[in-house]
């Protein structure tokens, strides 16, 4: 009799393990989303509708033998995972692969692909009507998003606010890399506000076209 492996989380790690064990174990993947999200392409999906369609991979096509339970894991104990008030899954092995969370649009917290797609479309349409956009954080994600925005919307004025005194302040980045990125940002007329922590969050949600001042 095959061992049952319950994997909690359907991100990169959880999906990789589930597919590798699918032929040799009774695999149950517990994940609230209806599709795997290729998060590395999320920022390109903000500006490109074709990429928006490519970042989602339905879980119902993931496993040949195992199954996917679209729900949250409510509790975990040795040999048992509770996913709802009336459903428990017995397990020989439990793997926690819950991953990390980042603000939209770097990652998506919504469980339904249709909801995320609508939000991406709304953001893209809002960007096309905007004159200026504010990005908070000059780390790798903020800088990548700045590059995507300035490439897709040349008319858009981009300002990056960063509380540290330089870009890419967290991490062992070479000074030459920082200088090269600063040059690219300047060539795209991106305004850097360094050493300037944001006093308060804007009064609108991320990706909503609405004038504000901070």
Role assignments for model-derived ranges:
Residues 10, 98-99, 214:
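Glycine-rich, N-terminal phosphate-binding loop of Rossmann-like dinucleotide-binding domains
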Residues 2-4, 64-134:
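FAD-binding core/adjacent interface of flavoenzyme oxidoreductases
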Residues 19, 125, 182-183:
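Alpha-helical segments flanking ligand/cofactor-binding loops in enzyme cores
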Residues 2-67, 144-175:
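Beta1-alpha1 glycine-rich phosphate/pyrophosphate-binding loop at the start
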Residues 133-148:
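Short strand-loop-helix active-site module centered on a catalytic nucleophile
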